Regions:
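A short acidic, Gly/Pro-enriched loop at the edge of an enzyme's catalytic core
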Residues: 99-110
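Class I SAM-dependent methyltransferase SAM/SAH-binding core
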Residues: 45-47, 51-100
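Conserved catalytic/acceptor-binding region of the Class I
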Residues: 22, 139-205, 220
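Conserved Class I S-adenosyl-L-methionine
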Residues: 191-257
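A short glycine-rich, Lys/Arg-flanked "PGG" loop and its adjoining helix->strand segment in the class I
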Residues: 124-139
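A short SAM/SAH-binding and catalytic strip from SAM-dependent methyltransferases
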Residues: 109-123
């Protein structure tokens, strides 16, 4: 298949920053920030902080008497996060894995993960680490997509469904973890305080191709025999011609320790 189908895979940091800057990204991030209720003096932990997208907003709320810790295991992400927060003296960037957080037990007032659990090996173990790191009464915010809810409008409904099925079964490790956040939080010994669902909507084909990986994941599906080559090409060409619509559900859960 031609490598010109869809946009090339962007570097992960650029992808995360662009997704966060979209209308849908800004909306759910602001909602999660409000539910997390970060206050002056709090110690805040951002697990899987990536290039530091959310660290400035957390630092602003924690104030001069608070502290923000960003944790990621990717050295390239850590470098971007350090650069982004170089002027924020109360922000510390640490290298570490979400399954074994480099944070002392019971030292955190607020913690969050954002589109991290869908990638990890054991989501329940990560939630257990968040519980360990937080103080009694602390709040933990979680946000994850449910990729089984991915809708791509097309007259070829069968191929749209095949694309979603391929995404959930072959592309994303924990593709439906979003719907299970409240259940998993309870199993980890956390008390669920709020559950919120938002629906990011894409009307611009190019933006959707960048964020949802329509072209690059379609190539994988065709190469793997999951979608017929000619039919997949026709499906993609129809999406590009428009009018375009795609959406998915993103679930946010706030828990207390």
């Amino acid at each position: 298949m031609s490598t010109t189908l869809g946009v090339p895979r962007p570097d992960q940091a650029s992808y995360m920053l662009r997704a966060a800057a979209s209308d849908a990204g800004r909306a759910y991030k602001q909602r999660l920030l409000e539910l997390l209720d970060v206050r002056a003096g709090h110690t805040v932990l951002d697990v899987g902080c990536g290039p530091g997208t959310d660290l400035p907003a957390l630092a602003e709320r924690a104030g001069d008497t608070g502290a923000v810790i960003g944790v990621d295991r990717d050295p390239a992400m850590l470098a971007r996060a350090r650069s982004r927060t170089a002027e924020l003296r109360r922000v510390e960037i640490r290298e570490g894995d979400a399954h074994a957080l480099p944070v002392e037990s019971g030292t955190v007032d607020r913690a969050r993960t954002d589109r991290v659990l869908m990638h990890v090996t054991e989501p329940l173990d990560v939630l257990g680490e968040l519980r360990r790191a937080t103080r009694p009464g602390a709040r933990i915010g979680l946000a994850e997509p449910d990729w089984d809810t991915l809708i791509v409008d097309s007259e070829d409904l069968e191929t749209s469904r095949a694309f979603t099925r391929f995404t959930t079964e072959e592309v994303v490790r924990n593709a439906t973890v979003g719907r299970g956040l409240a259940r998993l939080a309870g199993r980890a010994g956390l008390r669920v305080e709020a559950v919120d669902a938002t629906t990011p909507v894409f009307r611009d084909f190019q933006e959707a191709d960048h964020t949802l990986g329509l072209g690059r994941n379609l190539r994988k599906a065709i190469d793997g025999g999951h979608i017929d080559r000619a039919r997949g090409r026709d499906w993609f060409a129809g999406l590009a011609q428009g009018p375009f619509y795609a959406s998915f559900t993103l679930i946010s859960v706030v828990c207390s320790r």
